[in-house]
């Protein structure tokens, strides 16, 4: 077989291309001649073809616009339906309790609820304990107040009775009381009958005016003492037949002058803090509130008030000093 080199192949290809170009040039020249010959005949119909072409293109554009509008409307409806279906699906998940957008806030709310419930329980227990403590404090305070009032009442009654006994003793020593009153009292007591006995007491017939005594024996005795004192002051010229008075010796010096209290060489006024000492009892502190002729009122630290007779200070039952 004959072998051709690359240079031979290039020359062959170049020769072929020259032949093709020559043929094309001949064809184009022939076409130009035909075009020139037919251009004269087609000049008359060019205007009609342009109008038809424009109308045809306009119709095509309108059709294309209507198609585009229809496609846009269809796409919009399809997108709306897809979005609506997605929202419905998400709503169903929320209703069923499966949506993550619902589960995460729900878990946070439940955790907060548990924490607040625990805190409320602790606060409730603390409130109950506080109320219980207040109740116990009130009960204890009421009991202590009752005990202090009982002691104060006991001391007051005891002091009043001692004062009455002292006055009766002073009257007994200073005034001659006839024995007839005591004899009459004893006889009346002997004549008294049992109120539950079946015997009925016969009415006593009294002629003329009479006096019914409704007073107690102690009141009668006090009235009798007052009358005897008045008679003694009105008739000093009379010869007294009373026995010599035996005055009770006071252990301490105590008296009140112009709202002040004098006791064992010291003066006490209202508002001062004193220390009260009683036999067989612990000393207590108090504040003087009132100083009368024969008694002194003072206030204890717990707020209770009580009185102290000057005669008790004189006898040594109580003693006071500056605190």
From Swiss-Prot:
Disulfide bonds: none annotated. GO terms for cellular component: nucleus; Sin3-type complex. Residues 18-53 have a biased composition (Acidic residues). The modification Phosphoserine is found at residue 197. It is found in: Nucleus. Its main location: nucleus. There is a cross-link at residues 240, 246 (Glycyl lysine isopeptide (Lys-Gly) (interchain with G-Cter in SUMO2)). InterPro entries: Sds3. GO terms for molecular function: histone deacetylase binding. GO terms for biological process: negative regulation of cell migration; negative regulation of stem cell population maintenance; negative regulation of transcription by RNA polymerase II; negative regulation of transforming growth factor beta receptor signaling pathway; positive regulation of stem cell population maintenance. Keywords: Coiled coil, Growth regulation, Isopeptide bond, Nucleus, Phosphoprotein, Repressor, Transcription, Transcription regulation, Ubl conjugation. Residues 1-56 are annotated as: Disordered. Residues 1-17 have a biased composition (Basic and acidic residues). Residues 52-84, 149-180 form a coiled coil. Belongs to the BRMS1 family. Component of the Sin3/HDAC1 corepressor complex at least composed of BRMS1, BRMS1L and ING2/ING1L. Interacts with HDAC and SIN3A. Involved in the histone deacetylase (HDAC1)-dependent transcriptional repression activity. When overexpressed in lung cancer cell line that lacks p53/TP53 expression, inhibits cell growth. This is Breast cancer metastasis-suppressor 1-like protein. It comes from Homo sapiens (Human).
């Amino acid at each position: 077989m004959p072998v051709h080199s690359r240079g031979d192949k290039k020359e062959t290809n170049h020769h072929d291309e020259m032949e093709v170009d020559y043929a094309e040039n001949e064809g184009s020249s022939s076409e130009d001649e035909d075009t020139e010959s037919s251009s004269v005949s087609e000049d008359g119909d060019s205007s009609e073809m342009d109008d038809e072409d424009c109308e045809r293109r306009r119709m095509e554009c309108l059709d294309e616009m209507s198609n585009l509008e229809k496609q846009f409307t269809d796409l919009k409806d399809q997108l709306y339906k897809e979005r609506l279906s997605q929202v419905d699906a998400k709503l169903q998940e929320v209703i069923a309790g499966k949506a993550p957008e619902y589960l995460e806030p729900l878990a946070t709310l439940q955790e907060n609820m548990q924490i607040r419930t625990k805190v409320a329980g602790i606060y409730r227990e603390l409130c109950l304990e506080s109320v219980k403590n207040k109740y116990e404090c009130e009960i204890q305070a009421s009991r202590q107040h009752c005990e202090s009032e009982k002691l104060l009442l006991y001391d007051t009654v005891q002091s009043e009775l001692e004062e009455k006994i002292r006055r009766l003793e002073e009257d007994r020593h200073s005034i001659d009381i006839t024995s007839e009153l005591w004899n009459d009292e004893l006889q009346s007591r002997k004549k008294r009958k049992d109120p539950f006995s079946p015997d009925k007491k016969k009415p006593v017939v009294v002629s003329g005016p009479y006096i019914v005594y409704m007073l107690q024996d102690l009141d009668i005795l006090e009235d009798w003492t007052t009358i005897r004192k008045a008679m003694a002051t009105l008739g000093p010229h009379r010869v007294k037949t009373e026995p010599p008075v035996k005055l009770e010796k006071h252990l301490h010096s105590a008296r009140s002058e112009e709202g002040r209290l004098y006791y064992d060489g010291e003066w006490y006024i209202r508002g001062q803090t004193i220390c009260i000492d009683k036999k067989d009892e612990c000393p207590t502190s108090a504040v003087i509130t009132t100083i009368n002729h024969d008694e002194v009122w003072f206030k204890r630290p717990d707020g209770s008030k009580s009185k102290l007779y000057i005669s008790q200070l004189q006898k040594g039952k109580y003693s006071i000093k500056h605190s």
